[in-house]
Amino acid sequence: MSRYRGPRFKKIRRLGALPGLTNKRPRAESDLRNQSRSGKKSQYCIRLEEKQKLRFHYGLTERQLIQYVRIARKAKGSTGQVLLQLLEMRLDNILFRLGMASTIPAARQLVNHRHILVNGRIVDIPSYRCKPRDIITSKDNQKSRALIQNSLESSPHEELPNHLALDPSPYYKGLVNQIIDTKWVGLKINEFLVIEYYSRQTN
């Protein structure tokens, strides 16, 4: 299944806020309507919706998400929490959380178009897994800097998660301090329902 490129507002009306996909918010009456329907949902539908929230927020294909679940299952610790850490430490998501891109699709474009450096080297793979002590900057040209500055100036000034830092001078520089603590994940999600959904597909 390919990455979703359809109407974004349609997805947030059904699934709720997906800040990685769009900075728009569902209307309050839409939220109430969805809550009133929730009592009629089967357990399968509830698990499916949690999986879809994760997939659309991070901009993944179905195959990519299944692969991340498989990796998380082989790691030590809670599979659900490891899954969230893997997704949060992707380069496209780190750029989004730093405010250097307004959405994850916008961050993916920055990376694909070779505007982003990690530790002084161009990285053009959005799924690149960032690690502690990584330094993320724009390429040393006016266009790359302007794209990031415009995003930072237009994005809401939310508190950065504690695993990241942003140095504004002389040019914007993002720092990865540590692996994310899952309480700082930027999406309201029940990751355990996602693992349950995939319990048969990934055996």
UniProtKB/Swiss-Prot annotation:
Entry keyword annotation includes Transit peptide:
no
* Residue stretches making up the S4 RNA-binding domain: 89-150
Family annotation (InterPro entries): Ribosomal_uS4, Ribosomal_uS4_bac-type, Ribosomal_uS4_CS, Ribosomal_uS4_N, S4_RNA-bd, S4_RNA-bd_sf
> Which keywords does this Swiss-Prot/TrEMBL entry list?
Chloroplast, Plastid, Ribonucleoprotein, Ribosomal protein, RNA-binding, rRNA-binding
A biological process (GO) annotation for this entry? Answer: ribosomal small subunit biogenesis
Cystine pairs: none
Instruction: Spell out the CDD domains in the cross-references.
Output: S4
Which Pfam families does the entry link to? Ribosomal_S4, S4
Q: SUPFAM superfamilies, per this entry?
A: Alpha-L RNA-binding motif (SSF55174)
| One term under GO cellular component | chloroplast
The answer, when asked if RNA-binding is one of the entry's keywords, is yes
Compartments, as annotated in UniProt: Plastid, Chloroplast
Q: Which PANTHER family match?
A: 30S 40S RIBOSOMAL PROTEIN, SMALL RIBOSOMAL SUBUNIT PROTEIN US4M
Q: How does it assemble?
A: Part of the 30S ribosomal subunit. Contacts protein S5. The interaction surface between S4 and S5 is involved in control of translational fidelity.
Protein name per UniProt: Small ribosomal subunit protein uS4c
* Organism, scientific name: Ipomoea purpurea (Common morning glory)
Its organism's taxonomic lineage begins at: Eukaryota, Viridiplantae, Streptophyta, Embryophyta, Tracheophyta
